[in-house]
């Protein structure tokens, strides 16, 4: 009986030790651990960002000068990233053509640039279902209170529908993109 108890105790300890490993494995499975793509130009070399393109399925945001990609960033999206945003609280990132229309240096996240969602069409769709389309969709950095846990956000979809980048990337986007810049968000 004592051998059985020893084996049972060992098994219990092994299971308890494996639980954090299983959790970490689950997080890593959701994360994109690839190295980010090399940037093509130094900030001083970039004369104009004429538009921003987001490809949700690729988890990429591109700063464009005409047809040239001048910057590319790995992004995080809403917790429910597939499909167009339909209503407030659906945790989806909208799809379509919008404008980056204003910015907030003092937001709850490290800097934010507002996307002009909802459009008139977005309002009509939500209204047809008796729903509020939501709003306050932004490109932003990490939460201001993230502290030493910034690494935990990398590669995960964690926003309520916004497009998130690292704080360093947000500094660069903030510098390179002007208010009034068009943004196209694709599936």
Model segments located where?
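Positively charged n-region of N-terminal signal peptides that target proteins for export
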Residues: 1-5
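Sec/Tat signal peptide C-region and signal peptidase I cleavage site
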Residues: 20-24
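A general sequence property marking short-to-moderate contiguous segments
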Residues: 25-39
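Exported/periplasmic cell-wall-interacting domains
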Residues: 41, 94, 102-187
């Amino acid at each position: 009986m004592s051998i059985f108890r020893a084996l049972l105790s060992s098994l219990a300890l092994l299971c308890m030790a494996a639980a954090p490993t299983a959790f970490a494995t689950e997080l890593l499975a959701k994360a994109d651990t690839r190295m980010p793509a090399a940037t093509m130009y130094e900030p001083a070399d970039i004369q104009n960002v004429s538009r921003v393109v987001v490809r949700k399925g690729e988890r990429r945001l591109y700063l464009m000068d005409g047809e040239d990609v001048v910057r590319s960033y790995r992004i995080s999206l809403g917790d429910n990233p597939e499909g167009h945003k339909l209503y407030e609280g659906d945790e989806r990132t909208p799809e379509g053509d919008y404008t980056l229309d204003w910015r907030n240096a003092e937001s709850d996240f490290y800097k934010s640039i507002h996307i002009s969602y909802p459009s008139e069409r977005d309002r009509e769709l939500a209204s047809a279902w008796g729903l509020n389309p939501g709003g306050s969709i932004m490109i932003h950095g990490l939460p201001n209170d993230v502290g030493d846990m910034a690494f935990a956000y990398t590669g995960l979809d964690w926003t309520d529908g916004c497009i998130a980048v690292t704080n360093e990337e947000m500094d660069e986007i903030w510098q390179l993109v002007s208010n009034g810049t068009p943004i196209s968000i694709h599936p």
